[in-house]
């Protein structure tokens, strides 16, 4: 783990609320929100739209604690480069508000609480998956890949794809092909998401020596790979409809619509790979895309939604049958 660099000046907390705020910031709550949304999507799909509110609360809480633990350890490890990068230098550790040792104790406490909560109130599989997410994010991505491989995001993206597996396991006690497809969707979504950001802040990554794809291969190659991953991603999302049959018509239509917008934005970046505004637009949309895709999964999985689509399908078949009878 990296120690906070020496010229980071300590800052005192003036009250207990500032202490809570600093430790809260260590968990990177904005990242956790998206992870919890994918967890919920996994739960609803796995339970076919009928999820216990208590189990939902327990699983999301356990997932949030596990993600917070991983993020806090990441903050410890990256405190040296966080101080250099403009957007991260005021994080709790590089700014001196939290000591690395205290952050580690905090992270381990979160992880232990998460494991206990998920084991007792969900099941052991969900708990072990949550812990594997911490190990992969810290050990494989943060320690091994981030500063040493241009494929850091491609391989490391698996850590961010574990939450839907946790959600699915919490409600079913097992992992089906559909659960692994959710995992694969997020793995493939991750490179376009992060590489768009990397184009936007390429100079910062270059300054601290992180080998992101735009730094090593340039913006044009990065935009090309974003385009390829996007073209793979969109058809993958429709595999939930066929052949897996875990999502229906509403999901198919809206997932296609969201995907078309994603493709359009990736195409715009391909045509103008050095345009930071276009890269930033794609990065922001990729977040909305994943949130909305998961929301559509949840809506489509609800029992009353299936009732509506079934009624519409029956009405359409009746209409077509009547029209054919009149014509022939």
From Swiss-Prot:
NCBIfam families: cyoE_ctaB, PRK04375.1-2
Example of a GO MF term: protoheme IX farnesyltransferase activity
Miscellaneous notes: Carbon 2 of the heme B porphyrin ring is defined according to the Fischer nomenclature.
Full protein name: Protoheme IX farnesyltransferase
EC id: 2.5.1.141
Main location: membrane
Function noted in UniProt: Converts heme B (protoheme IX) to heme O by substitution of the vinyl group on carbon 2 of heme B porphyrin ring with a hydroxyethyl farnesyl side group.
Annotated catalysed reactions: heme b + (2E,6E)-farnesyl diphosphate + H2O = Fe(II)-heme o + diphosphate
Localization per record: Cell inner membrane
InterPro entries (UniProt xref): Protohaem_IX_farnesylTrfase, UbiA_prenyltransferase, UbiA_prenylTrfase_CS, UbiA_sf
Residues that span the membrane, as ranges: 31-51, 53-73, 120-140, 153-173, 181-201, 226-246, 250-270, 285-305
Keywords, sorted A to Z: Cell inner membrane, Cell membrane, Heme biosynthesis, Membrane, Transferase, Transmembrane, Transmembrane helix
CDD domains: PT_UbiA_Cox10
One cellular component (GO) term of this entry: plasma membrane
PROSITE patterns cross-referenced by the UniProt entry: UBIA (PS00943)
Main enzyme class: transferase
Protein family: Belongs to the UbiA prenyltransferase family. Protoheme IX farnesyltransferase subfamily.
Residues in coiled coil: none
Record-level GO BP terms: heme O biosynthetic process
Pathway terms, separated by semicolons: Porphyrin-containing compound metabolism; heme O biosynthesis; heme O from protoheme: step 1/1
